[in-house]
Amino acid sequence: MIDLNNISKINWANTRISILGAGKSGIAAAALGTHIGAQIFISEDSDSPEIIENIGELKYEVGGHSNSVLDADILVKSPGIPNDVPIIKECENQNIPIVSEIEFASWFTTSPILALTGSNGKTTTVNLLHEMCISDGRTSLLGGNVGMPFSENVLWELTSNIENSVHVLELSSFQLEHINTFSPLIAGILNISPDHLDRYADINAYAAEKLKLATHIDKTGWLVFNADDPILAKSLKDTTRSIVFSLKQNEKCHFKLNATKVYSGEVDDPDILFNFEDTKLKGFHNLQNILAAATMAHSFGISREAIHNSIINFTPIPHRLEWVGSIQNVDFFNDSKATNIAAAIAAIESFDDNLILILGGKDKGSTDFTQLIPTMENRVKSIIVYGDAGREIKNQLNENFPLTYCGDFEDALLTANNNSNAGDTILLSPACASFDQFSNYEERGNKFVEIFTKLELGN
């Protein structure tokens, strides 16, 4: 049996690896496995021609997972595959080690790893951290849940003549489910709020996967976490080699906040690191993201100048409280990435009043949308709901706000526009997944921009 705690002793030429899932991460893991000389077998539930084309000449099966998967020494599981599928259970019964693509790729790099997880804000934070590393002269490889699959970056690293490389990873709870020896030098946890409860039994099960990162840090590394998050503050308060960031207190923080100004050292230091008002990001949740990235970068040894310059020059990531434009003094913001309650609350809190809020899509699992009410009061003038979750949202919020139901996403935005007046803000922050009408949140956000463009042109 393969000893996953002694990777260096494995003879890869004699090792059979089954890869479950032929999406981006699965194909990348297969390419990396082929490079190291392992025997690769890919099993994919779909049988689409595109999937088959991506697999290429490797040994594979499509249209379901047969017992051929069990003819393996290691199973690499793609993150989108739930743990309760029968073939996973059978692998467990036969004691076949199951690892994530993240765990697998980590075996083949000696470069430092900066890894971040959390419920909301991950992509903005890791992109900013990535820019800080580049600004400091590092070869930064952005991957995981954003950018390239980790395996693809590791393979490129192995086959290219690059120096001073660092892996910056965004990690979802799914990607953390089967880690073993994965040990980043710097690990960050932004926040934990209810999400993916269609996959996890409850918030505790979901939080456990996120918190797993805190126990997988290199012995010389650091854990960076948000002291304002109640789950993190309680769970990680006794963690050694940890540094916190906070909007509410400066104790134990390297970067300290005074109003919108951030200092390294004491708050009366005249040489501030940056003023949040000088950045291109909106909303105090983004100030939190900046503090997280800056703290991780500082812990890694990135220069103060590189941190400052990256913050000031950073451009917001699409679909994350993205200002799309203005029509007749009505602003349009695309926050399609806000697929849960906490993300929507953070977006709504970024505005003072006159909000027309678009909610809806596919509910992730018995969501209590009334949690939005305290934040929406005095800010939201009306709500437009759409999609599979639209009627349930209407049932929960109808007594509190003027509310209109639209079955279709485009109708929802057109209705919001028709109901708007000069000085209003139309905010798409749906608090739901996109899978009822779109392939992903990016497609939904792009549709928002497309409709806005038509409205702007008067079409």
Show the residue positions of the predicted features.
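Residue-level signal for inorganic ion chemistry
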Residues: 33, 75, 116, 145, ...
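Short internal beta-strands
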Residues: 39-45, 224-227, 358-360, 379-388
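Residue-level detector of alpha-helix initiation sites
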Residues: 24, 82, 120-124, 287, ...
